[in-house]
Amino acid sequence: MLASYASDPLKSRGRLYKEIPTSYRNEFERDRDRIIHTNAFRRLQYKTQVFINHEGDHYRNRLTHSLEVSTVARSVASTLNLSNDLAETIALAHDLGHTPFGHAGERALNECMREYNGFSHNAQSLKILTLLEKRYAAYNGVNLTWEVLEGIVKHNGPILGEINEYIAEYNKQNDLELSTYASAEAQIAALADDISYISHDLEDSIGAKIIDFNSLAELKYIDQHVVELKSKFKNISSSCLIYEVVRKLIHELITDLLWQTKENLNKEKITNIDEIRNLNYQIVDFTEKTNKNIKETKKFLHERVYKSNKITAISLKCTKIVQGLFKVYMDDINLLPVNWKMLIDSNETYSKARVIADYIAGMTDRFAIQEYNQLCSTSYITCF
């Protein structure tokens, strides 16, 4: 049974465009299915998480990462008697707005858009789901419930100060209450993302030989598992060792998250969802010690992995591709597909830049490489 402060699909605030409910799925299950059936969701399988798609068959991409986040989010929500369907749905959608080539691609596109209010993958996720996906005759987007859209936009907390242009524009017709916290389910999705990416980026980085087990000594709370497993299993293989370490790490983080969140709920005597939204801090959280460990792990990954020679070299090529494509389309909009060119408002520069950014952001790694080779490159790029 759902807790009194859970997001109940039977009490959803509904959709921007009214629809008749189905008898065999609740509203959040329906949204989950709509997201899975989008073109944007399918494209995630060819978008970079950390390692370029064709570098290896077992490295994570945006799709596998989103699936892993959704399983963590669903488990945590279920344990707390919250809506596992809502938590899962927000988790599945949280990366839809990412560019090709991961964070390097986003930084490059944001730089290209500097004079045009920049680029945000979070706002792009909202734009995809409310405008760019064309699947229904009656409206643009996929007409998701208020709770899912709120969770996607605010899963990292209230939006205060300067608001992204598209989020502000959409909010005029469907008020997402940007200054408050999102539901507990959305907060779970955000922290499930942290759990998944720090654990699995460590795993993939060891698999790619960017770091090794000795370097994990810098992270004492993780290294203790390495020492324990090596002592218990004398002949354990490296592949099995990293899997066991990651498994223990995920369990440890989830257990900590559940304990602290229950403490917060009890301390605040939460009885309904509005109390969660109107708190001055997020109700779903890790303990102070674990937050410190996570911060140290993110710093470790940034310094030892994301800034490594291998990833830096790849990032430079990715930046060149994204910026090259942006320039060539800005110079000649006739190179865009007809259906995209039609979206430009009378060849006005700002409109042109935004449409081009939407087009590039939707590309997969391989399609961006293909387009770059065809339109920009004097030296053919096949892989990195």
UniProtKB/Swiss-Prot annotation:
Disulfide bonds: none annotated. SUPFAM superfamilies: HD-domain/PDEase-like (SSF109604). Keywords: Hydrolase. Residues 62-198 form the HD domain. The keyword Hydrolase applies. GO terms for molecular function: dGTPase activity. InterPro entries: dGTPase, dGTPase-like, dNTPase_2, HD/PDEase_dom, HD_domain, PHydrolase_assoc_dom. NCBIfam families: dGTP_triPase (TIGR01353), PRK01286.1-1 (NF002326), PRK01286.1-5 (NF002330). PANTHER family: DEOXYGUANOSINETRIPHOSPHATE TRIPHOSPHOHYDROLASE-LIKE PROTEIN, DEOXYNUCLEOSIDE TRIPHOSPHATE TRIPHOSPHOHYDROLASE. This is Deoxyguanosinetriphosphate triphosphohydrolase-like protein. The lineage of its organism: Bacteria, Pseudomonadati, Pseudomonadota, Alphaproteobacteria, Rickettsiales.
